[in-house]
Amino acid sequence: MKMTAPLMVTLLAAIGLALPSGLLAAESCVGCHAEKTPAAVAQWRQSAHGKAGIGCESCHGSDHDRILKGEAKVDLTRCAPCHPKATKEHQASRHGLGLHTGWGCTRNLPDRKKDECRFCHRQGDEAPSTLVQCARFLKQSSEMAHVGCNSCHMVEGSCDSCHSKHSTDLAIARDPASCAKCHMGPDHPQWEMWQTSEHGILNKSAGRKLGPDCQSCHMPAGTHNVSSGITMNSGGVPYPAGQRAKARDEMVKICSGCHAPSFARRELEQGDAVRSQSLAILKEAEETILDLNTLGLLDPMPDHRPPHPLSGFQLVTDAQMLYEDTSHIERLFFKMKKYDYAKTVKGAYHQNPAYAHWYGNAELKMDLIDIKSEARRLKERKKAEPGQAGIEEELRSLKGRFERGALSAGDYAKEKARLLDRGN
């Protein structure tokens, strides 16, 4: 006869034996929660935790008032003591930086919540555990920050981002749909790319043995380090050569489970080439905007708009750039960098021709056309104003390019001499 937890409690009590502490704690909760949250109790009873006698208090603690207030979070610190290997792998991966890359210090916000401090500070420790900030997060309302940002970025400290809360059925975490909750949309549509790639189509028609899924390539052998084999940061910028070479060897090894190593390396190197070409297009657009800023032609200029949460009244074109409180040309650049560059590069690495070309590369190049056209319009508008000194403007633009490293000292001197000769 299969012995249920309640029956075990009754029998052990009847013969005077001590109850396992976890099971005893669990039963003190189950009596009430079987009525109030029956689904959670049913899931726990069928889980590995329930069958091993790991009770509610082991994860939730015993302070019922804090639990009801939502203050007793079941986060990674609760899971780590029993799952040290998975925790170490997770923390070494990009998922281990998920919260910090999507967060920002809220101490100066009028509607800040005090419990947010715990994401970057340990209890009683003023030194932050990370200096990473996210300007876009800081511009959102608290509701949007929770729903639209933290729902995904909590993956750093919340195991139930991928696993369920009370069930321990690994089929849930092994389902690629669990990745789609976050890895989809205009800025990183890996889910859509995989679904419509040859890998995804084979997976749907013939299963994992013929068509690999997210976990096959990014969590081989069940590792929680989802960053194995990744050669660039989340913004698509390549890692240093040594780190990149090591990661490439890791990915070739993963691909070699189905493909010849030489074939895998060639395919990945094609992705590298697409990345380099795309980055050059992106840099050309960025240089156009930096030049307009030097000339004072952005509309509005950074000092005539609400301050950037991290940089104040400075132009920002890096990973902290905003999609609000900017000029129109910066809005075009945001789409180019955050959406179209990412689709081009990640589409290439995920072997999806439509995302690499039409959704990515074509849009990237048309973005550059739009940005250059807008730059010409702004410059022509300035020329139409009375008292415009053309040579002085060109010299200022030239100096700005030199100071940003876009021109060598030799080229700067040559172009400067040419402009001065023209002005004489």
Role assignments for model-derived ranges:
Residues 1-8, 100:
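Positively charged n-region of N-terminal signal peptides that target proteins for export
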Residues 5-8, 126, 223, 397, ...:
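Intrinsically disordered, low-complexity segments enriched in glycine/proline and serine/threonine
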Residues 5-6, 12, 27, 38, ...:
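Low-complexity, intrinsically disordered short peptide segments enriched in small/polar/basic residues
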Residues 8-22:
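Bacterial N-terminal signal peptides
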Residues 22-384:
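Short sequence/structural segments immediately N-terminal
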Residues 386-424:
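Alpha-helical, heptad-rich or low-complexity scaffold/stalk segments
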